[in-house]
């Protein structure tokens, strides 16, 4: 079975995949064996992964807030995350 592409994966799967990639990138950078150019490229990729993780966490937090508002339990509804092109 083919692996889902990141664009088609669920937000949770995207978060987990981005976090795993970020952790691997940090490990590579911490070895000190990368050239300056490779380190800069890795850092740039890491910043992008970090932003993806932050965005996924913000969406999850919003979803939890929408679902757990005790003042308006009838207002709980499925969360459709905003689409981000980029």
From Swiss-Prot:
Keyword terms, alphabetized: Cytoplasm, Exonuclease, Hydrolase, Nuclease
Q: Which reaction does it catalyse?
A: Exonucleolytic cleavage in either 5'- to 3'- or 3'- to 5'-direction to yield nucleoside 5'-phosphates
EC no. given is 3.1.11.6
* Location of this chain's protein in the cell: Cytoplasm
User: Could you give one GO CC term from the UniProt record?
Assistant: exodeoxyribonuclease VII complex
* GO MF annotations in UniProt: exodeoxyribonuclease VII activity
Primary subcellular site in the record, as a coarse category: cytoplasm
A Gene Ontology biological process noted in the UniProt record is: DNA catabolic process
Gene3D superfamilies, per database record: Exonuclease VII, small subunit (1.10.287.1040)
Q: Which purpose does this protein serve, as stated in its record? A: Bidirectionally degrades single-stranded DNA into large acid-insoluble oligonucleotides, which are then degraded further into small acid-soluble oligonucleotides.
Q: What is this protein called?
A: Exodeoxyribonuclease 7 small subunit
The major lineage groups are: Bacteria, Pseudomonadati, Pseudomonadota, Gammaproteobacteria, Lysobacterales
